[in-house]
Amino acid sequence: VGIVSRSTEGLNWMQQKMTEVTNLGNETGTLADALKGADIFVGVSAPNIVTPEMVASMNRDAILFAMANPVPEIMPDVAKAAGARVVGTGRSDFPNQVNNVVAFPGIFKGALEGRATQITEEMKLAAAEAIAGLVPEAELNEDNIMPEAFNPKVAELVAEAVKSHIKA
């Protein structure tokens, strides 16, 4: 567990390519090294690999998206106690569920209704902006950055946004 670099052994071709665009300085080290002074952590790996000490070493008001399921890289209450300001997981039983179920039904509905032949970057950005706009400014806070996954407005608004960005 640590920083993936061009010198990391056992990478497939896609992982190797990702190191070229995500680790420009070809940095190496442990996960703890990577989190020192970081503003954000996006984890999609394994349960309980982030410690409170790692979170405490991050910049003030750090954001953590601990997406491993069913057990995240760090539990939200532990991350917050260690200094994180915003924590999201893939789980519906914690605030800020970050899950593709928020995006995909609306993306596919919009693409199908608009008879799109491909999903473009513009369509994905329109979907993201629609999702971001679903939490009213007055309700936006550290524990409410995402719309509820089963909010009936989500799929409809995302579909409309996607349809409006289909190129003929």
At which residue positions do the language-model features occur?
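Glycine-rich phosphate/diphosphate-binding loop of Rossmann-like nucleotide-binding domains
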Residues: 1-46
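Surface-exposed, flexible loop/turn segments at secondary-structure boundaries
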Residues: 3, 49, 72
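Short acidic, glycine/serine/threonine-rich loops at helix termini
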Residues: 5-11, 53-55, 75-80, 99
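A short, aliphatic-rich alpha-helical micro-motif
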Residues: 34-35, 55-59
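Glycine/threonine-rich flexible loop motifs
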Residues: 45-55
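Glycine-centered, small-residue-biased loops immediately flanking beta-strands
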Residues: 62
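Adenosine-phosphate binding glycine-rich loop
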Residues: 66-167
